[in-house]
Amino acid sequence: MNEQANTPALAVNDKVPQVVFKTRIRDESVGGDNPFVWKDVTTEEIFDGRRVAIFSLPGAFTPTCSSTHLPGFESKYDELRAKGVDEVYCISVNDAFSMFQWAKQLQVQKVQMLPDGNGGFSRKMGMLVKKENLGFGERSWRYSMLVDNGVITLLNAEAGKVDNCETDPFECSDVNTLLSQIDQLAASAA
C-alpha cells in the first residue's frame, strides 16, 4: 500500500516540482511526413508568471480519461480562460507519441498535452502510484489543480490513493469542480 494514501506530498501553497518534460513539437523545417522535433519544456516555462489549470490522469486511451476527464476540460476550456486561466494542460505518464495520437483521436484542439513519460513530475507531486494489477506499471493518480506563478492554489486529488487500486475514482478532479472553486476564490477575494 502507498504510505501517502489520501495525502499528496505537495499541497496548496506549495511550489510545483521542477522537472523537464520531453515533448514533440511541429517544425516545418524538418519536412517529410513527420515534421516534429524533440523539445525539452521546463516547469518554469509552463508555470512562471502564469495561471495554469492542470489535470492529471492514469493513461491515454483509457475509458474514464477518454470519455469524460479530457473531453470535459476540452469542452470547458473557454470558460476556464474567461476566469483568468492562461492555459490548460493534461498530464499523463505516457510518451509524447501516445499523447499526440490520443489528442488527435479525441479531436482535442485547445487543451495542451503534456507527456510525463518517466513519471518525474507525478513522482515529485506525490501522485505516482503502481498500477501493476492492470499491467500499466507506474501511473499518475487522478487529480486537478490550479497553479498561480508556480504555486499550487487549488488541488483536487481523488480519494483512496493506493498502489494497485481496484477502482478508478473520479469524483473531484473534474472540470466543473475546478470551475466552481475558481469562482469561490474570486468571490472570497472580492
Regions found by a protein language model. Name each.
Residues 1-190:
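Chalcogenol-based redox active-site neighborhoods
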